[in-house]
Amino acid sequence: MKNKYYPLRSSMDELSAKNDNEIDLEKGPLPEYNSEDGSTLPPYSENINLKDPKQMGANNPNLFNTDESTTPPDYGEDSLSITHRENHSSGTADNSSTSPLKKAFLSFISIFVLNVPAVCYLTYKDALFKDYGKDEWVYFAVWCASCLMIFISLWYFYETWIKAVKVTVIFLAQCIKVTVVFLAQCVKVTSISLAKCVKLTAVFLAQCVKVTAVFLAQCVKVISIGLFNIRREMMIIIWLLWLIICCILFGCVKSGDLNLNKALIYSTCTISAVLLLIVSSVCIPFWTFERTLAKLAKVFLLQSGIVLVLNGTMFLRGKHFEWTGCEIEASVLFIMGNVLFLCEMECPGALIRTRNSIRNGIAFILEGAGRAIRGANDNNDIPLGEMEVESEV
């Protein structure tokens, strides 16, 4: 015989408890009920004056409802065990939702992916099902049996290895994400560090260049002032010594005792240009450096013209000139530089006066030619009447 469990409280008790706990805002707080004298009615009781239970049930149809749906349930041992199993299994996932076909397909795909490298290797070696003997077929059978066992294991433990694969994939994704973020941070920090290093290096080099330029400018200024304040006789002595050295070098080269053609040419050109630069910047200090370079360029152009004229003249006369163009250039530069240096040292301001004289002479010639041309035009514009009057007079 089964033991049935019935609830201790009926619907009447629930209704009374509900009425006891509720307070009607329109009627006010609940009055105290005295059960001995019965003078005080139960709180808000509407059905207490009704002596007929049917009338009470009419007011509250759920009070004496004898429908089967309201009968107490059967709380036997079987029902309790079933309810316990349902509640226990409701918190876990239903593993039977995955179809067997899906399990088999995913398990086969896993085995296929694992066997692809072996098949590719055997195909590459041209050893797949080719010249198989007894041992090879035994190995192949073992391989097939192993694949079958692995397939069964994967199919049986589908949820476990799928969960492991998911966890592994998530872990690898997180590792890749962390690695990418770390590399990005490293690249960012490295780029910022390199930018700072480049900036500091550029600032340092700029400061070095600035300091070097200022130092060289100070050195040039001191040397220029010293050369400008030196005695003219000392400058002439230095020039004469240099001239003697150049003549000795020329004589040695032409006599064949010294083979320094290129070195002599380059040194002569360089030192002569330096002498001309010193003359231009020291003896004529109001020339700017740009104008000095322009004068040097004009000197080189003039020398080039002289070289071309000499070579052209020798070519037209049919004579062979032993000197090359570089030697002619060096000789002309040497002569012109030393002549200009000597003229400026003997007569300070001679170059400026020569330049101004040449410019004024050219201007005077052009002005005279212009006046002559205008005078001829004025004589041609005389009217005929004036010419007749002049003839009569």
From Swiss-Prot:
Q: Which domain of life is it from?
A: Eukaryota
Q: Which InterPro entries match?
A: WTF (IPR004982)
Q: Which GO terms describe its cellular component?
A: ascus epiplasm; cytoplasm; endoplasmic reticulum membrane; Golgi apparatus; vacuolar membrane
On whether Transmembrane is a keyword of this UniProt record, the answer is yes
Which key words tag this protein in UniProt? Cytoplasm, Endoplasmic reticulum, Membrane, Toxin, Transmembrane, Transmembrane helix, Vacuole
Q: So what family is this one in?
A: Belongs to the WTF family.
What is its quaternary makeup? Homomer. Forms protein aggregates. The two isoforms can interact with each other and with themselves. High sequence similarity is required for their interaction.
Q: What exactly does this protein do?
A: Promotes unequal transmission of alleles from the parental zygote to progeny spores by acting as poison/antidote system where the poison and antidote proteins are produced from the same locus; the poison component is trans-acting and targets all spores within an ascus whereas the antidote component is spore-specific, leading to poisoning of all progeny that do not inherit the allele.
What is the name of the protein in this document? Meiotic driver wtf19
> Which gene underlies this protein?
wtf19
